[in-house]
Amino acid sequence: MTEESEETVLYIEHRYVCSECNQLYGSLEEVLMHQNSHVPQQHFELVGVADPGVTVATDTASGTGLYQTLVQESQYQCLECGQLLMSPSQLLEHQELHLKMMAPQEAVPAEPSPKAPPLSSSTIHYECVDCKALFASQELWLNHRQTHLRATPTKAPAPVVLGSPVVLGPPVGQARVAVEHSYRKAEEGGEGATVPSAAATTTEVVTEVELLLYKCSECSQLFQLPADFLEHQATHFPAPVPESQEPALQQEVQASSPAEVPVSQPDPLPASDHSYELRNGEAIGRDRRGRRARRNNSGEAGGAATQELFCSACDQLFLSPHQLQQHLRSHREGVFKCPLCSRVFPSPSSLDQHLGDHSSESHFLCVDCGLAFGTEALLLAHRRAHTPNPLHSCPCGKTFVNLTKFLYHRRTHGVGGVPLPTTPVPPEEPVIGFPEPAPAETGEPEAPEPPVSEETSAGPAAPGTYRCLLCSREFGKALQLTRHQRFVHRLERRHKCSICGKMFKKKSHVRNHLRTHTGERPFPCPDCSKPFNSPANLARHRLTHTGERPYRCGDCGKAFTQSSTLRQHRLVHAQHFPYRCQECGVRFHRPYRLLMHRYHHTGEYPYKCRECPRSFLLRRLLEVHQLVVHAGRQPHRCPSCGAAFPSSLRLREHRCAAAAAQAPRRFECGTCGKKVGSAARLQAHEAAHAAAGPGEVLAKEPPAPRAPRATRAPVASPAALGSTATASPAAPARRRGLECSECKKLFSTETSLQVHRRIHTGERPYPCPDCGKAFRQSTHLKDHRRLHTGERPFACEVCGKAFAISMRLAEHRRIHTGERPYSCPDCGKSYRSFSNLWKHRKTHQQQHQAAVRQQLAEAEAAVGLAVMETAVEALPLVEAIEIYPLAEAEGVQISG
């Protein structure tokens, strides 16, 4: 009796493609590990019949056992015939033989199936999927398979024999691949066991498995072949790159023809879609046309594949019947429109997938950081932040994350994927039809516009370059210039944020802006681990670690990290202050400074505490307030300036001006010997020498007291100041441009002059919201508000005493050092603070005023005594009558 044989079919779940060898993997982790090492260590299973003496798991139905032999890591197995090879190069050459034999050959009548020798129960036998004949060796099996291929060169691949109904799942994007050939066990009945022929084999239930491995990201259609997938993708892009030949095979394999293949070599089978893509352009065209013909009509000849597919309703041309069916369904059922964004989709499945994006459902999880994304495309774009190199690299130097764009780009190269010597593709040339990636997408910071000098802006553009007429930037291609003028100088903002309604010029800017609403910060700093929402902000932040300031002012030498900050700084040199406060008239050269200034007039600050009615100008002050007052914890303070921060990370980011002032001054002026703390200040100081002239010398400013504070003391008379009131004739004052009309004092900026004028006008535009006391400057109000909050951020490092104002700490330090820098010019007595000197100077003023009053009184008494002595003398009657009115007018009493 012939025992019913078992069929074992191996299913492999594939979802991801390796960009180097086109190997398919079932998970993203596997393809990433494979691409890092690119050592094709693949494990497949061979199913055979166990020896009688081997203990194996028995099948309850047949009682026979199956064993599984794993392929060693140093061996490579062909997925077509199961042959084991020792190196990747041998595997490639072996698979090339399969591909070369796929070409249609002359029709040869099918040879009768040779009678196989008696089968042994301890060996693996190979079954023909067409006639069910069994063979003991691969050579006999492949030779027999070749007879079927010669007889029907355009016949569709034989369906896979399945013992049970096939259930394809999971759904979209995860196809199951059935290996074409299966291994059957031989009968163990006796010596007379014969091999069943094609006629004697009973008809079994067969199921054809359609392999749909490639999914279009635009319309969600599935395709079986990469070529069909790429042709379909070309319909979505305006200017696809024309097809060219794929990387060719090795020269010795190309030179050989199918007739020259030795008989001992295994004959080819139709290559599975998960094998290496090693076909040349001609073989691809033949195979694609044959497969299309088989899909259209399995009984027609191959010439039917070239029939053009037109829609009868709109006369639109399609590349495949699948696309035509999708299009016809849109005529019957209509299109599917999203109710939220009005986007149109060709199928309900693509609309459902799109609605999942609106519902913020995240099905794709990043294995590195745990972030979830709604689509696989967003996940792959996110993984660029974790991988130093993109997933797909080309020998010409370009890298791609999208597989479709990489395959399109690879077609532009010649044989072997090497750039053509006649028309090399530069690495920076963008592919036509794909937009240039934005800075937030590529991870590279957007290069701010460098300062353009008059010489470069006035000169003509270099040959082969294109210059923008608005900003004088030069580009190597006209397409880059057009894109620059469109996105940089265009005032229209078409892209709107769906949450807050803010408009943007680019979609990438909207995506970066949306992260401010979601709180996502997927780009951490490798130095301090602070996360950012865009690569451009990360690159700008990293300049704080490196200390690099690439944008330098040509007037004063001050350097900046951003070109926008440099442009605003130039307004200071140009004395251009376009932003004026309507309350007090103070002008600013930056709009945000005017905004911060106006908060002091209203008394309402933007950051309000939820637990108390207090409000603050800065978020940092609010966080410190909540930490100290409501949480009862101590903040992190800067040891140099005493500023408080809610976390140690914010303290490390703090750039202390007091520490910079206390740093040793290493830059010395060669003209006057003055030392400054930076090269920019030295350059500005030398520019002041050049403006003063060769014969003039700049006056050296004393370290303390500062000139603005010393001039605030009202002096009764010039004599009280002595020699300190006049300047030395050998040291003329520094030239300054703005003069006060009241006291003739000079200032360098308009803001300083505006603040000084409040002394004469009595204006105090900064009231305290707690007690109502007003101040002339916002810094005075900030120091005053610490008296209400009880905050004392400035602590003495010697005794630990804390102060609310930094000036009080500086005065307190002189107690420990014994320094008394403020001396009275009248008596020579010295004091630690200027306020004590000011109080002492008042006593001298009072003494001086008392002495003046005494001198005036003595003078008046002397005048009255002289009048009285004159009145004692005897006068004639007429003269006496004339004197009386004069005496009464003078207030002198005449006795007698």
Swiss-Prot record:
Residues 707-732 have a biased composition (Low complexity). GO terms for cellular component: nucleus. GO terms for biological process: regulation of transcription by RNA polymerase II. The modification Phosphoserine is found at S113, S164, S298, S717, S728. Residues 239-301, 434-460, 687-733 are annotated as: Disordered. Residues 274-287 have a biased composition (Basic and acidic residues). It holds the Pfam family zf-C2H2. The modification Asymmetric dimethylarginine is found at R832. It is found in: Nucleus. The keyword Repressor does not apply. A zinc finger (C2H2-type) spans 16-38, 76-98, 126-148, 214-236, 309-331, 336-358, 364-386, 392-413, 466-489, 495-517, 523-545, 551-573, 579-601, 607-630, 636-659, 667-689, 738-760, 766-788, 794-816, 822-844. One of its GO terms (molecular function) is zinc ion binding. InterPro entries: C2H2-ZF_domain-containing, Znf_C2H2_sf, Znf_C2H2_type. Its main location: nucleus. The modification Phosphothreonine is found at T724. Residues 247-257 have a biased composition (Polar residues). It comes from the Eukaryota. Keywords: DNA-binding, Metal-binding, Methylation, Nucleus, Phosphoprotein, Repeat, Transcription, Transcription regulation, Zinc, Zinc-finger. Belongs to the krueppel C2H2-type zinc-finger protein family. May be involved in transcriptional regulation. This is Zinc finger protein 574. The gene is ZNF574.
